[in-house]
Amino acid sequence: MYLIFDCSSIEKPVSYSVPFSDTFAWPKMLHLSWIILDKDLKPIKDENHVIEPDGFEITSDIEQRCQLSKEDIEAKGQPLEKVLKAFDKGLSEAYYVLAHNLRFNENVLAAEYVRKGIDHSLFRKDRICLMQESTFFCKLPSKTGGYKWPTITELHAIIFQKAYSPPNNARADVIAATRCFKALKMGKQLDDLFDDE
């Protein structure tokens, strides 16, 4: 089974090169969404969690970055520990874990597990970055030569010839990433990753 996830953080990391264990460098998470597909790519679980703010205030910049309103956050926010435990339960049901820009998403998420002192199985799974694996498929020219990594909005537009809304919202992004993964998988663009199936 496949778990596709996306999270929204309240800001950018201080540095993308530092490990997630440096929790001062990695931002807090405000929104986590994931979808689990069975071997036939049919959804069997669909989770969407807004996280209640802990140690920070919701600013207009955060609202814009996460595409969530302060009212929604206050109404729907859940304790971080509850969300982290629910995600790890989802991990236990999956063999493959995917995300667009996996390194960013997994580091934000893993830093939260460290902060809460909760064990998890994320790094014990086969993990795949949809952004990196779709680079040759998209063939978007880089300014420095070769191809650049596509954003999820670019990948979605190339596959489906249309945009989705609102980008940068974890819920919308994970739906888009799941649609793109299914299209690429069914189009045999990812066969080298799953040749044991």
Predicted regions span which residues?
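Extreme N-terminal starter segment of soluble prokaryotic enzymes
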Residues: M1-L3
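Metal-dependent phosphoesterase signature
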Residues: E63-A86
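Metal-dependent phosphoesterase core characteristic of DEDDh/y 3'-5' exonuclease domains
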Residues: S15, W26-L68, D88-E197
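Short acidic, Gly/Ser-rich segments with clustered Asp/Glu that frequently serve as metal-coordination loops
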Residues: C7-Y16, F20-D22
